[in-house]
Amino acid sequence: MQSYQQPLRVGVGGPVGSGKTALLECLCKAMRDHYQIAVVTNDIYTKEDQRILTEAGALEPERIVGVETGGCPHTAIREDASMNLAAVEALARKFGNLEVIFVESGGDNLSATFSPELADLTIYVIDVAEGEKIPRKGGPGITKSDFLVINKTDLAPYVGASLEVMERDTQRMRPERPWTFSNLKKGDGLQAVIDFIVERGMLGVRG
């Protein structure tokens, strides 16, 4: 039987449209020259996120696998993660030397969490367009994720959101846990996410 190493599994969750796929594209493009990476995407009835990442050239197509979860998306990352676990194992066996596998959840609500059997680290993405109230609403995605990304800061003036209020509420809701504001269109906040993954995942700094 071919041996393979166990990669770091990083779960990326958040509501529909928050920027999960955009974050993954940025992470893959920034890290692929230094680390062996693959991605598992989750969609309810399609493999749309897999297609988006493939067409964006985030990674080689064979390193991106789409899972059609059906039903409620959080079930596939928490209560019954078997499809995702199988996809992760298949990628790890196929490449043998993978160091990081990102698992993107289907769009879900603030209560979504990853099973510890599926993700070693969790990143949760919300966006400013949902309003400044989102951080203080709490929920496991806000309070328990290992890293929180508040995306689309450029939209704050258009939706009447105060970044100062969001910062205050975020620090109150997760006082000991890291987070960052981001505007992925400009790359703002991306390095903070990469540094977190490298440090907490004990990957070693390269490049």
UniProtKB/Swiss-Prot annotation:
UniProtKB keywords: Chaperone, Cytoplasm, GTP-binding, Nickel insertion, Nucleotide-binding
GO MF annotation terms: GTP binding; GTPase activity; nickel cation binding
Q: Where does GTP bind?
A: G14, P15, V16, G17, S18, G19, K20, T21
Question: An example Gene Ontology cellular component term from the record?
Answer: cytoplasm
Q: Where in the cell is it found?
A: Cytoplasm
Chief subcellular location: cytoplasm
Q: Which GO terms describe its biological process?
A: urea catabolic process
Q: Output the Gene3D superfamilies linked to this UniProt entry.
A: P-loop containing nucleotide triphosphate hydrolases
InterPro entries assigned to the protein according to its UniProt record, in alphabetical order: CobW/HypB/UreG_nucleotide-bd (IPR003495), P-loop_NTPase (IPR027417), UreG (IPR004400)
Q: Name one Pfam family in it.
A: cobW
* Subunit comment: Homodimer. UreD, UreF and UreG form a complex that acts as a GTP-hydrolysis-dependent molecular chaperone, activating the urease apoprotein by helping to assemble the nickel containing metallocenter of UreC. The UreE protein probably delivers the nickel.
Recorded family membership = Belongs to the SIMIBI class G3E GTPase family. UreG subfamily.
HAMAP family assigned to the protein according to its UniProt record, in alphabetical order = UreG (MF_01389)
What's this protein's function?
Facilitates the functional incorporation of the urease nickel metallocenter. This process requires GTP hydrolysis, probably effectuated by UreG.
Please report the name of this protein according to its UniProt entry: Urease accessory protein UreG
Q: Which organism is it from?
A: Pseudomonas putida (strain W619)
